């Protein structure tokens, strides 16, 4: 092959020039093999990229976002467990003439389950920060948790707004569960408001991590090592001819 063979650089690759005539070439060292007329250097694409050629990601903001996401995820797990626990207690006060739309819809249980799952993924994302699927799943579930908490806020406000004719157990002893039920709904309302803020903050940090990871493209500056440099020979003066020497002697 007499013509120069070129390879288009792709991601995770290094360009190295190798001689056509088979002389060994050490990367980074200039070869002193002379260039022959019919032997031109070839460009080969060698897989792999040196560590010094990869652009590093700003690790400090990423680690900060991961730690904050882990803390918020732990709080989400606690809120989810509180929803399930208080929902179980609410089941005991329904016999006391307390009407709870949120309980009949099952929100304290499936809402708390969503909060626990999203919080668990936020904690797991801190342990595996380079897992794109885990970060994306955590982001999606945090968005779902934010929507669920907004629905919970509406349901618990509705529970507290429903007029209960038997709100005075002194006059209606069989309506003892109204006041405890309203207290539980009020506590769950506060937890839903807290969960909404945490889920929105976790979604914000998750968007930052996903965007940072998707934009983390390795920038490679290919180095071309000259295998057979072209050396221009210095002009050499030709020796005097025999006839010129005879004339000089005369």
UniProtKB/Swiss-Prot annotation:
Q: Which UniProt keywords apply?
A: Membrane, Receptor, Transmembrane, Transmembrane helix
Question: Does the entry feature the keyword Nucleus, yes or no?
Answer: no
Q: Where does it sit, as one GO cellular component term?
A: plasma membrane
Q: Where in the cell is it found?
A: Membrane
Transmembrane domains' residue ranges:
75-95, 99-119, 137-157, 181-201
Entry comment describing in which tissues the protein is expressed: Expressed by hematopoietic tissues and cells lines.
GO terms classed as biological process: cell surface receptor signaling pathway
For this protein, the record's InterPro entries field holds:
CD20-like (IPR007237), MS4A (IPR030417)
Protein's membrane topology = Multi-pass membrane protein
Segments on the Extracellular face: 96-98, 158-180
The entry sums up its family as follows: Belongs to the MS4A family.
What is the protein name for this chain?
Answer: Membrane-spanning 4-domains subfamily A member 8
Q: Which organism is it from?
A: Homo sapiens (Human)
Q: What does UniProt list as this organism's lineage?
A: Eukaryota, Metazoa, Chordata, Craniata, Vertebrata
């Amino acid at each position: 092959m007499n013509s120069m063979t070129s390879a288009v650089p792709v991601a995770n690759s290094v360009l190295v020039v190798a001689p056509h005539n088979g002389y060994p070439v050490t990367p980074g060292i200039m070869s002193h093999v002379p260039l022959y007329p019919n032997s031109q250097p070839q460009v080969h694409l060698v897989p792999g990229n040196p560590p010094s050629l990869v652009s590093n990601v700003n690790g400090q903001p990423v680690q900060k976002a991961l730690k904050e996401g882990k803390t918020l995820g732990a709080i989400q797990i606690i809120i989810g467990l509180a929803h399930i626990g208080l929902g179980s207690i609410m089941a005991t006060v329904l016999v006391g003439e307390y009407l709870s739309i949120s309980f009949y819809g099952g929100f304290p249980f499936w809402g708390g389950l969503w909060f626990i799952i999203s919080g668990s993924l936020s904690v797991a994302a801190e342990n595996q920060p380079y897992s794109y699927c885990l970060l994306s799943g955590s982001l999606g579930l945090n968005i779902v948790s934010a929507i669920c908490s907004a629905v919970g806020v509406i349901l618990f406000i509705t529970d507290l707004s429903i007029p209960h004719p038997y709100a005075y157990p002194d006059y209606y002893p069989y309506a003892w569960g109204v006041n405890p039920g309203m207290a539980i709904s009020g506590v769950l309302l506060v937890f839903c408001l807290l969960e909404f803020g945490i889920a929105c903050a976790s979604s914000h940090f998750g968007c930052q991590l996903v965007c940072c990871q998707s934009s983390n493209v390795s920038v490679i500056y290919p180095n071309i090592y000259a295998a057979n440099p072209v050396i221009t020979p210095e002009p050499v003066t030709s020796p005097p001819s025999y006839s010129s020497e005879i004339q000089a002697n005369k």
